[in-house]
Amino acid sequence: MPARCVALRFMFSSVWLSSLLFVCGAVRADEPIVSEKDSAIHVPTPAAVVAKMLEVAKVAKEDVVYDLGCGDGRIVIAAASKYGCRAVGYDIDARKVKESQENVKRNGVEKLVQIECQDIFKLDLSKATVITLFLLPEMNIQLIPQLEKMKAGARVVCHEFALKDIQHDQKLTVTTQPDGVPRDIYLYTLPLKRVVEK
């Protein structure tokens, strides 16, 4: 496993110890953010990766984008700001939800973006046309049954961790600056296609 994945796993594991859900969104910094109250680590998605995730999903004004584990709300804010689409961010951490809501207002996209405090594993995802994920592989696996209920043509975009045993339609790597770290992005289109072992 690449060193960057090991490091990310360590940070994600720290979050599991302090909360039920790791969340990772993205608005400016790429550095891990440590909550003062519970030491939970939130790893923001770099802006360049956010932009590429939305681009590869071919987000358009008519789309409805869900970000599961929205952190500071940067992905849904970027989607609404650039493409004029509706977007919903979900997070189980009430403080991150409040932060996201403040960022939504600050960016003037309240009419397009909602932020909700919910358990992502209990969501009905059928109304989403695009879903963005930056979660641990185990969490991605747990979400697959929900993702499979999305409508044909809907897209799922994963940052760094792929959906296990699901064939991706596209994989690309974005090298972020100034750290020079390569970050993988995986695109899936519904219906999801299982990997067939040869």
How would you label these PLM feature ranges?
Residues 126-142:
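A short SAM/SAH-binding and catalytic strip from SAM-dependent methyltransferases
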Residues 9-24:
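Bacterial N-terminal signal peptides
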Residues 62-71:
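Conserved class I S-adenosyl-L-methionine
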Residues 86-91:
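Conserved SAM-binding motif I beta-strand of class I
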Residues 93-127:
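S-adenosyl-L-methionine
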Residues 28-61:
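Class I SAM-dependent transferase core
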Residues 74-85:
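Conserved SAM-binding loop of SAM-dependent methyltransferases across substrates and taxa
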